[in-house]
Amino acid sequence: MRFSPLPFAFLVGLSILGLSGCRESNDSVGTGSQAAPAGTDPVPTTTGKKRIILLNNTESPFWDAARAGIAKAAEDLKLEENGFTASMDSNTNGEEGQIEKLRQYGTQSDIAAVIISPTSATNAAIADELKNLKEKGIIIGTFDSDLDTKFQETREFYVGTNNTRGGEVLGAAAKGLQPDGGEYVQFVGYGSMQNAVQRMDGFTSAAGDKFTQKGRRTDDTDPNRARDNVRDSIDQNSSLSVLVGIWSYNAPAIVDVVKEKNMRDKFTIVTFDAEPIAIEQMSEGMIDAMVVQNPFGMGYDSVRYVYSKLRGDAATIAEMFPNMKDSGGNIRDTGLKIVAPDEGSPLTPEMFKEFGPSVQFLKLSEFKAWLKEYNLTGS
């Protein structure tokens, strides 16, 4: 996978996006049409513009940075001037919710592209609806999480994290924090999503033989269930010593329960993503390591590729995907950060050098400064 240059590409002008992270979940960028309420279908444009839609898997603060990336791409590429809009649509009803939204897209004549973070990598109905859209001439891509290999011929590209590597980075962090090993449970929303499977498998692989997995608990993106899963895991496993959050909201769910039980000293806590509350929780000493993705880059690059394809811009496509025709060449890696507390952490940059330049080690204060510079509250 190729590391995206976008962390540098969006340095200029991102300061104007302070409000972008607060957009409604399907706010259309580059158009005067009215946006629908969060979690509903985007309103078809009445201006004759073609729409580029990014459909997420569930609503979360994680997507705010992706919306900022979409907005910046719309501005840089002058979408409105050239007859296009770009927006994110939020799915709030699991696999069935995505299937229904894809069916509705098929009835709308103004859609140029659909880029999806599929709730299930292996759901044939999702793949079938994407295929139906593709047959109508709509460009299909994935971001954040990919389809299973057997369905990948349906989509042209994937933009996002190398999720196996992300899991390995988190596993390496756990190993560095607790070198003698221990028992762990991994917490996630949907166990069938490719990013979930790859992250959990990657964690297990990198953590090594001294660590023993005691479970993989799913919550269907219900925050109450997420906390219940943590409580049950702690109550049922007296030797448990590592709690692993795989999706963004799992971090605060873990911290809530550990605080509730007054058991911080018993657990190493390692998590994915950096919701604003999780950043504050690390500041309070409640999280030991975070693997942070680049959702801004996911949003920006997805729009950039689609617009280049629509315009016949072969040079940009070749720059973004130089090996597009090769196996795996239609995947664009947007990179990772591993974030550690400022004080008292045994983690060092050298522990993560094996993962190459696409993985950047930052102390929490450095990460906060990076967010502040670009007017982001999380990533």
Regions found by a protein language model. Give the residues of each.
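A residue-level marker of the well-folded mature domains of exported/periplasmic proteins
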Residues: 22-379
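Bacterial N-terminal signal peptides
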Residues: 9-18
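Bacterial N-terminal signal peptides that target proteins for export
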Residues: 1-9
